[in-house]
Amino acid sequence: MKITILSLFPSIITPFFENSIMKKVVDKGIISYEVISIRDFSKDKHKRCDDVPYGGGAGMVLKVQPIVDALEYVNANSKTTIFVSPSGLKYTQKLAYDLSKKDELVIICGRYEGLDQRVIDLYVDLEISVGDYVLSSGEVAALVIIDSVYRLLDGVINPNSLCEESFSFECGLLEYPHYTRPYEFRNLKVPDVLLSGHHEEIKKWRLVKSVEKTKKNRFDLYLKYLEMRGEKNDGFDKKN
Protein backbone atom coordinates (compact mmCIF):
# COMPACT_ATOMS: atom_id res chain seq x y z
CA MET A 1 0.00 0.00 0.00
CA LYS A 2 1.10 3.55 -0.70
CA ILE A 3 -0.18 6.43 1.44
CA THR A 4 0.23 10.03 0.31
CA ILE A 5 -0.50 12.80 2.80
CA LEU A 6 -1.12 16.43 1.81
CA SER A 7 -0.37 18.77 4.68
CA LEU A 8 0.53 22.35 5.55
CA PHE A 9 2.80 20.94 8.27
CA PRO A 10 4.65 17.85 6.98
CA SER A 11 6.92 17.80 10.04
CA ILE A 12 3.96 16.55 12.10
CA ILE A 13 3.48 13.55 9.82
CA THR A 14 6.99 12.38 8.90
CA PRO A 15 8.18 11.26 12.38
CA PHE A 16 5.28 8.81 12.60
CA PHE A 17 6.74 6.80 9.72
CA GLU A 18 10.27 6.91 11.15
CA ASN A 19 9.65 5.28 14.53
CA SER A 20 8.60 2.04 16.18
CA ILE A 21 6.55 -0.57 14.32
CA MET A 22 5.74 1.75 11.43
CA LYS A 23 9.43 2.12 10.54
CA LYS A 24 9.73 -1.67 10.36
CA VAL A 25 6.64 -1.84 8.16
CA VAL A 26 8.14 0.76 5.81
CA ASP A 27 11.53 -1.00 5.80
CA LYS A 28 9.83 -4.28 4.86
CA GLY A 29 8.10 -2.60 1.93
CA ILE A 30 4.60 -3.32 3.25
CA ILE A 31 3.84 0.40 3.12
CA SER A 32 5.39 3.27 1.20
CA TYR A 33 4.54 6.87 1.91
CA GLU A 34 4.93 10.38 0.58
CA VAL A 35 4.30 13.57 2.53
CA ILE A 36 3.46 16.53 0.30
CA SER A 37 3.68 20.13 1.50
CA ILE A 38 0.65 22.01 0.22
CA ARG A 39 2.62 25.27 0.49
CA ASP A 40 4.97 24.08 -2.26
CA PHE A 41 2.07 24.41 -4.71
CA SER A 42 0.90 27.86 -3.65
CA LYS A 43 1.23 30.57 -6.30
CA ASP A 44 1.08 33.29 -3.67
CA LYS A 45 4.43 35.04 -3.26
CA HIS A 46 4.20 34.48 0.50
CA LYS A 47 3.11 30.83 0.04
CA ARG A 48 -0.24 31.49 1.71
CA CYS A 49 -2.77 28.70 1.28
CA ASP A 50 -5.80 30.20 3.01
CA ASP A 51 -8.17 33.12 2.51
CA VAL A 52 -11.31 34.67 3.99
CA PRO A 53 -14.58 32.83 3.30
CA TYR A 54 -17.09 34.14 0.77
CA GLY A 55 -20.25 35.22 2.60
CA GLY A 56 -18.33 36.18 5.70
CA GLY A 57 -17.79 34.26 8.88
CA ALA A 58 -15.06 33.47 11.36
CA GLY A 59 -11.73 31.96 10.45
CA MET A 60 -9.97 31.18 7.20
CA VAL A 61 -10.58 28.61 4.46
CA LEU A 62 -7.97 26.55 2.62
CA LYS A 63 -7.77 27.70 -1.01
CA VAL A 64 -8.64 25.46 -3.92
CA GLN A 65 -5.63 26.13 -6.18
CA PRO A 66 -2.70 24.80 -4.09
CA ILE A 67 -4.54 21.65 -3.06
CA VAL A 68 -5.87 20.82 -6.53
CA ASP A 69 -2.39 21.33 -7.99
CA ALA A 70 -0.96 19.03 -5.32
CA LEU A 71 -3.64 16.41 -6.01
CA GLU A 72 -2.93 16.54 -9.73
CA TYR A 73 0.78 16.18 -9.00
CA VAL A 74 0.15 12.89 -7.16
CA ASN A 75 -2.41 11.74 -9.75
CA ALA A 76 -5.13 11.54 -7.10
CA ASN A 77 -7.90 10.70 -9.57
CA SER A 78 -6.54 7.16 -9.83
CA LYS A 79 -6.44 6.68 -6.04
CA THR A 80 -8.84 6.72 -3.09
CA THR A 81 -8.77 10.31 -1.84
CA ILE A 82 -9.81 11.16 1.72
CA PHE A 83 -10.43 14.49 3.40
CA VAL A 84 -10.41 14.38 7.20
CA SER A 85 -13.23 16.61 8.39
CA PRO A 86 -15.65 16.88 11.34
CA SER A 87 -18.40 16.91 8.70
CA GLY A 88 -17.45 13.50 7.35
CA LEU A 89 -18.57 9.92 7.87
CA LYS A 90 -17.87 8.68 11.37
CA TYR A 91 -14.75 6.53 11.33
CA THR A 92 -15.23 2.91 12.36
CA GLN A 93 -13.25 -0.30 12.46
CA LYS A 94 -15.23 -1.54 9.47
CA LEU A 95 -14.15 1.49 7.46
CA ALA A 96 -10.55 0.84 8.52
CA TYR A 97 -10.87 -2.71 7.14
CA ASP A 98 -12.32 -1.37 3.90
CA LEU A 99 -9.49 1.13 3.47
CA SER A 100 -6.87 -1.54 4.20
CA LYS A 101 -7.95 -3.29 0.99
CA LYS A 102 -7.04 -0.28 -1.16
CA ASP A 103 -3.75 -0.12 -3.06
CA GLU A 104 -3.24 3.62 -2.65
CA LEU A 105 -4.68 6.28 -0.36
CA VAL A 106 -4.36 10.06 -0.56
CA ILE A 107 -5.24 11.92 2.64
CA ILE A 108 -5.83 15.68 2.74
CA CYS A 109 -5.22 17.22 6.16
CA GLY A 110 -7.56 20.10 6.91
CA ARG A 111 -6.79 23.25 8.86
CA TYR A 112 -8.58 26.40 9.95
CA GLU A 113 -12.32 26.58 9.23
CA GLY A 114 -12.27 24.08 6.41
CA LEU A 115 -11.52 23.43 2.78
CA ASP A 116 -12.91 25.06 -0.36
CA GLN A 117 -15.82 22.83 -1.37
CA ARG A 118 -14.59 22.65 -4.96
CA VAL A 119 -11.66 20.49 -3.88
CA ILE A 120 -14.14 18.03 -2.38
CA ASP A 121 -16.38 18.15 -5.45
CA LEU A 122 -13.49 17.50 -7.84
CA TYR A 123 -11.34 14.98 -6.01
CA VAL A 124 -12.54 13.66 -2.66
CA ASP A 125 -13.98 10.14 -2.51
CA LEU A 126 -14.53 10.07 1.25
CA GLU A 127 -14.89 12.69 3.96
CA ILE A 128 -14.05 11.06 7.27
CA SER A 129 -14.54 12.27 10.85
CA VAL A 130 -12.57 10.48 13.57
CA GLY A 131 -15.03 11.50 16.28
CA ASP A 132 -17.54 13.96 17.61
CA TYR A 133 -15.01 16.50 18.80
CA VAL A 134 -12.97 19.34 17.31
CA LEU A 135 -9.25 19.14 16.52
CA SER A 136 -7.02 22.04 15.54
CA SER A 137 -4.98 19.74 13.33
CA GLY A 138 -6.15 17.54 10.48
CA GLU A 139 -2.77 15.85 10.71
CA VAL A 140 -3.74 14.24 14.01
CA ALA A 141 -6.91 12.82 12.47
CA ALA A 142 -4.97 11.57 9.44
CA LEU A 143 -2.55 9.70 11.71
CA VAL A 144 -5.48 8.02 13.46
CA ILE A 145 -6.65 6.68 10.11
CA ILE A 146 -3.18 5.62 9.01
CA ASP A 147 -2.45 3.86 12.30
CA SER A 148 -5.71 1.92 12.25
CA VAL A 149 -5.26 0.88 8.60
CA TYR A 150 -1.63 -0.19 8.37
CA ARG A 151 -1.88 -2.68 11.25
CA LEU A 152 -4.54 -4.59 9.29
CA LEU A 153 -2.19 -5.22 6.35
CA ASP A 154 -0.75 -8.68 5.81
CA GLY A 155 2.58 -9.16 7.54
CA VAL A 156 2.20 -6.38 10.12
CA ILE A 157 0.52 -8.06 13.10
CA ASN A 158 0.01 -11.73 13.86
CA PRO A 159 -3.51 -12.72 12.70
CA ASN A 160 -4.15 -14.36 16.08
CA SER A 161 -3.48 -11.04 17.80
CA LEU A 162 -5.93 -9.25 15.52
CA CYS A 163 -8.61 -11.66 16.67
CA GLU A 164 -8.20 -10.43 20.26
CA GLU A 165 -8.21 -6.69 19.80
CA SER A 166 -9.16 -3.91 22.17
CA PHE A 167 -12.18 -3.61 19.92
CA SER A 168 -13.19 -6.80 18.16
CA PHE A 169 -14.96 -5.96 14.93
CA GLU A 170 -16.14 -9.53 14.68
CA CYS A 171 -17.99 -9.68 18.00
CA GLY A 172 -18.54 -5.96 18.60
CA LEU A 173 -17.32 -5.98 22.21
CA LEU A 174 -14.62 -4.05 24.03
CA GLU A 175 -11.68 -6.08 25.24
CA TYR A 176 -11.54 -7.82 28.62
CA PRO A 177 -9.13 -6.70 31.42
CA HIS A 178 -5.48 -7.80 31.27
CA TYR A 179 -3.11 -8.81 34.08
CA THR A 180 0.57 -9.73 34.34
CA ARG A 181 3.13 -10.20 37.14
CA PRO A 182 3.14 -9.65 40.06
CA TYR A 183 0.19 -11.72 41.26
CA GLU A 184 -0.58 -9.21 44.03
CA PHE A 185 -0.04 -5.46 44.10
CA ARG A 186 -1.28 -3.23 46.92
CA ASN A 187 -3.76 -5.90 48.00
CA LEU A 188 -5.14 -6.23 44.46
CA LYS A 189 -4.84 -9.80 43.18
CA VAL A 190 -5.07 -11.33 39.74
CA PRO A 191 -8.43 -13.16 39.35
CA ASP A 192 -7.93 -16.82 40.25
CA VAL A 193 -9.55 -18.07 37.06
CA LEU A 194 -6.64 -16.67 35.03
CA LEU A 195 -4.23 -18.87 36.99
CA SER A 196 -6.42 -21.97 36.85
CA GLY A 197 -5.19 -23.32 33.53
CA HIS A 198 -8.80 -24.08 32.51
CA HIS A 199 -8.94 -22.48 29.08
CA GLU A 200 -12.70 -22.77 28.66
CA GLU A 201 -13.31 -21.11 32.03
CA ILE A 202 -10.85 -18.36 31.14
CA LYS A 203 -12.64 -17.84 27.83
CA LYS A 204 -16.00 -17.57 29.59
CA TRP A 205 -14.60 -15.12 32.16
CA ARG A 206 -13.16 -12.92 29.44
CA LEU A 207 -16.45 -12.85 27.55
CA VAL A 208 -18.36 -11.87 30.70
CA LYS A 209 -15.88 -9.08 31.42
CA SER A 210 -16.02 -7.87 27.81
CA VAL A 211 -19.80 -7.67 27.97
CA GLU A 212 -19.65 -5.83 31.31
CA LYS A 213 -17.11 -3.30 30.05
CA THR A 214 -19.00 -2.73 26.80
CA LYS A 215 -22.27 -2.17 28.65
CA LYS A 216 -20.59 0.32 30.99
CA ASN A 217 -18.43 2.26 28.51
CA ARG A 218 -20.14 1.83 25.12
CA PHE A 219 -23.83 1.18 25.65
CA ASP A 220 -24.45 1.67 21.93
CA LEU A 221 -22.16 -1.28 21.13
CA TYR A 222 -23.76 -3.33 23.88
CA LEU A 223 -27.18 -2.89 22.28
CA LYS A 224 -25.75 -3.90 18.89
CA TYR A 225 -24.21 -6.97 20.50
CA LEU A 226 -27.59 -7.97 21.94
CA GLU A 227 -29.23 -7.40 18.58
CA MET A 228 -26.61 -9.53 16.85
CA ARG A 229 -27.34 -12.35 19.31
CA GLY A 230 -31.09 -11.97 18.86
CA GLU A 231 -31.52 -10.76 22.44
CA LYS A 232 -33.31 -7.75 23.87
CA ASN A 233 -32.09 -5.07 26.22
CA ASP A 234 -32.45 -6.35 29.77
CA GLY A 235 -34.25 -3.19 30.83
CA PHE A 236 -31.30 -1.60 32.60
CA ASP A 237 -29.98 1.69 31.36
CA LYS A 238 -26.28 2.28 30.87
CA LYS A 239 -25.79 3.51 34.42
CA ASN A 240 -26.78 0.15 35.92
Curated annotation (Swiss-Prot):
Localization terms from the record: Cytoplasm
Membrane-traversing stretches: none
Record's catalysed reaction(s): guanosine(37) in tRNA + S-adenosyl-L-methionine = N(1)-methylguanosine(37) in tRNA + S-adenosyl-L-homocysteine + H(+)
Enzyme Commission number(s) from the entry: 2.1.1.228
GO-annotated cellular components: cytosol
SS bond partners: none
Residues that bind S-adenosyl-L-methionine: G110, V130, G131, D132, Y133, V134, L135
Record's keyword terms, sorted: Cytoplasm, Methyltransferase, S-adenosyl-L-methionine, Transferase, tRNA processing
Short name of one Pfam family: tRNA_m1G_MT
SUPFAM superfamilies per UniProt: alpha/beta knot
A GO MF term: tRNA (guanine(37)-N1)-methyltransferase activity
GO biological process: tRNA N1-guanine methylation
Subunit note: Homodimer.
Function comment: Specifically methylates guanosine-37 in various tRNAs.
Family: Belongs to the RNA methyltransferase TrmD family.
Protein name: tRNA (guanine-N(1)-)-methyltransferase
Lineage: Bacteria, Pseudomonadati, Spirochaetota, Spirochaetia, Spirochaetales
